[in-house]
Amino acid sequence: MKNKFLYIILFSFSFSQFDLDARMLGMSGAYTSIASGYQSMGVNPANLVSNQSLSLNLFSANMFMVNDFLSVDLYNQLNGADFDNTSSTSYYSKNDILGQIKGSNIDIEAGVVAPFPIFNFAYKNFGITTHNKSYSKFHIPDTVLDVMLNGNTKDQRFLLDLGGEFISCNEIGLSYAQKVDYLGFPIYLGYTFKYIQGLAFFKMRDIQQDGSYILTQQTSFHASGKYLVEQAFGGTGTSSDFGLLLPEFYEGWNIGASLINLGGSVKFTSDNPTRQYLGSSFESTSGLRQNEYYYLDFKLDTMSVMTAFDSDVEFFSSNSIKVGIFSDIPLEEDYMPGDILYYTVNSNGDSLINVGESSIDIEDVIDLGNGSYLVPSSGLAGSQLQSTTSKDVNLDYPSSLRLGISKNFDEFGILSIDMVTGFDDSFGNSNKFRLSIATEIDRVSENFPIRIGASFGGRQPSSYSLGFGYKAGPLNFDFGRKYYSGIIRNKAKGAEFALNLSIDLTDFKNYSIKFGIPKINLPKLPKLPI
């Protein structure tokens, strides 16, 4: 039962570099120059030039979850292990456990890509795509596991850098592709314009200078932490995809390139239609208004054996308040009635922050260190939280560059190679190149292609993919799965699964689909005597 629960935790779930469909997943993302039909949108819109008829999505789902620490194999080794007796046959070193952590945190990521049925289609060189992308990530500092294994070491400062993020957006894209000839060479060009509907955004981060911590000394404990939880509902943005394909450019090799989500951004504001339509539901659920966030802090001050049992000594305190974030603070001479904060300059030329709102105590204002300040918001009006100095949530939408080559070998199948890199590290993106190599084998049967692929580099661990397709007339069924950090399930530290059902009417005239009840020959019954 425990193993089944672990499999669910590791493998039941899955931004810019997401695998968008089952075939792409089976090819480990090596898809830039081979994606076809509606599936080329979001990967390389130039491939729409080769679309001869109608291709339509009926159902599709892609989910993944990956971590950088625990696998089923490691769990089985730790389950029942002896961590102290080195002579035990089940001994497992604590240092070896901590050595499994890459960096200073245990990172856990999950995501979902959910295309809306029917509303993803391409007709010849024009296409429409609509889908939801959701991504979450949270990290646990390695010091938590260190304390669990070794206890709190004296005079060692254990950092408590807890944090995470979540974003969910709908994308609606319109694509168009065109073939041009240059010096006798065909060139495919494609473009996609995307409207982005931001549904929800959450982010928790450690804002204490030098980091939140716990410290054990000879006779006492000390701890301190400050965290900010940001949220937003209802955003709007746009982005663009540009694609290029050189079909059979050199000895049958196709060369493709694309820029995905170029110039993309999402801004969450109070006048957004999503916010206006569902704003009351969001506020009643979260208890927060637009541009209002949670500030959390705690402090453990010199707790010892004596103070722990002394009821008159308050050694622990915690707080949770609603705040607004204010930046672009004006100088005193530019101060306008209604401004929350303003700067004055003393005789030494230093800027000092002042409060323009009488209901706020200057001692409660928290400097974030980047020209922004946290201000308690319980006494502020909604209009003040949405003033020119109040900070709106404005996110850069993850964008990436894709480069790919492929070739269709007779009596074998397709070999495809891709290089992908992001322009930032936000929401699952990576600004490091990731190499993907894959093959789609149709030698056994053109109606049953088998896909095998692998990816290396970038921010995520190496991954290994396997998938297949089945064609029944115009109906296409595809399945793909990917394991991270291992080829087999027990060694993997994450997994991704995808299913896809679609229609392709390119060869519709040649299809022969018959529906009927199969003829059943019943055995003859013996004649009864008269």
Positions of PLM-derived features:
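Outer-membrane beta-barrel porins/channels
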Residues: Q17-L25, A122, F126-I530
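Generic signature of intrinsically disordered, low-complexity, basic-rich segments
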Residues: L10-S12, Q77, D82-N85, I196, ...
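Residue-level micro-sites within transmembrane alpha helices that shape
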Residues: K2-N3, V43
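Intrinsic disorder/low-complexity segments enriched in polar/small residues
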Residues: N3-F5, L78, T89, I172
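N-terminal, post-signal peptide beta-strand-biased segments of exported outer-membrane/organellar beta-barrel
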Residues: F15-I140, L145, N261-V266, D504
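Sec-dependent N-terminal signal peptides
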Residues: N3-S14
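General helical structural elements
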Residues: L6-I8, M27, G198
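Generic N-terminal leader/processing signal
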Residues: M1-K2, L525
